[in-house]
């Protein structure tokens, strides 16, 4: 079985100072691509699992989200890094099993890529990210303010990667 790191997007890979509704709103943190490259080199699959309820609420369309993700992937690839797949939940009010804190997106990717969730990590900046990781059976790393349920709490993705690779 394979090991993976599941990343939330906003607040982990890119700045979330304002909503990312268009490609020009996406501002990657300077350490993101290098952090992902370290994970790639260590043999981890790297996935993004992101709640994008703005689609259901009408702030942007799935086409816009695809353009944002194309830009994100191009910027990551410039550094030689790779995101294996991006999974998103477009729901906000609709009941579903994909919107975090549900583990649906993580479990879907784990099944598709034969991932051992017990040897994998979920990294997020919100409590719902950590709860999704726990429900999926991953180790969890919270970025920013401490959350007692998380296995680790760090300042940014680069620090999280150092924990994973130690």
Regions found by a protein language model. Name each.
Residues 3, 63, 67-84, 93-122, ...:
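Asp-based, Mg2+/Mn2+-dependent phosphohydrolase catalytic module
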Residues 32, 36-69, 83-94, 133:
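Substrate-recognition element of Asp-dependent hydrolases with the DxDx(T/V) motif
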Residues 13-16, 51-53, 84-85, 107-110:
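A short alpha-helix capping/helix-coil boundary motif
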Residues 17, 21-22, 54-59, 92-97, ...:
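A short acidic, helix-capping loop that chelates divalent metal ions and anchors anionic groups
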């Amino acid at each position: 079985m394979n090991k993976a790191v599941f990343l939330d997007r906003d607040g982990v890979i890119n700045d979330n100072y304002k909503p990312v509704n268009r490609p020009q709103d996406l501002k990657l943190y300077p350490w993101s691509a290098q952090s992902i490259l370290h994970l790639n080199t260590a043999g981890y699959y790297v996935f993004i699992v992101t709640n994008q309820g703005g689609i259901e609420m009408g702030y942007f369309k799935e086409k816009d989200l695809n353009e944002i993700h194309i830009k994100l992937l191009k910027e990551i690839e410039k550094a030689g890094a790779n995101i294996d797949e991006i999974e998103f939940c477009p729901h906000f009010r609709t009941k579903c099993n994909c919107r975090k804190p549900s583990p649906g997106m993580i479990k879907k990717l784990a099944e598709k890529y034969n991932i051992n969730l017990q040897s994998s990590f979920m990294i997020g900046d919100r409590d719902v990210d950590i709860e999704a990781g726990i429900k999926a059976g991953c180790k969890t790393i919270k970025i920013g303010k401490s959350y007692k349920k998380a296995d680790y709490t760090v300042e940014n993705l680069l620090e999280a990667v150092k924990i994973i690779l130690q």
